């Protein structure tokens, strides 16, 4: 069934609204994908904070005009699908890569992260990186560790002094009597 101009315009507008705030995308192609496989992929992408669509190449190119992922959607050939997010690109890449390992019918074409087009190899490398949350927690640990060590050292001086005084009291060295020489 051919799309009417009005229906094409509606699809372009809908996709354009979705892509407007997207900062990262992974474009792929597939052959003989079953409905259950497609459903599973959509679930994984949604769980990673993204959206997934099978797109007509020319409509996707028009819809992406003026967006950060425009460069990735220009000049596509063959069957194409796009997973996109405005959130963590690593989470999206991990979700897609995990699913692709189990489903050979799907292959990556390219990706785009913050306006930079990345190759299939770089998509795989992106999937192996730690996510934003993990990087932030490691960074906070590195920032907090020196202050924590300093506080421990400063507390140790007072604690050690208290231990010495306590030992002196227990042995009777501070009883007020002068020790004979």
UniProtKB/Swiss-Prot annotation:
GO terms for cellular component: ribonucleoprotein complex; ribosome. GO terms for biological process: translation. GO terms for molecular function: large ribosomal subunit rRNA binding. SUPFAM superfamilies: Ribosomal protein L10-like (SSF160369). Keywords: Ribonucleoprotein, Ribosomal protein, RNA-binding, rRNA-binding. It comes from the Bacteria. Belongs to the universal ribosomal protein uL10 family. Forms part of the ribosomal stalk, playing a central role in the interaction of the ribosome with GTP-bound translation factors. Part of the ribosomal stalk of the 50S ribosomal subunit. The N-terminus interacts with L11 and the large rRNA to form the base of the stalk. The C-terminus forms an elongated spine to which L12 dimers bind in a sequential fashion forming a multimeric L10(L12)X complex. NCBIfam families: PRK00099.1-1. This is Large ribosomal subunit protein uL10.
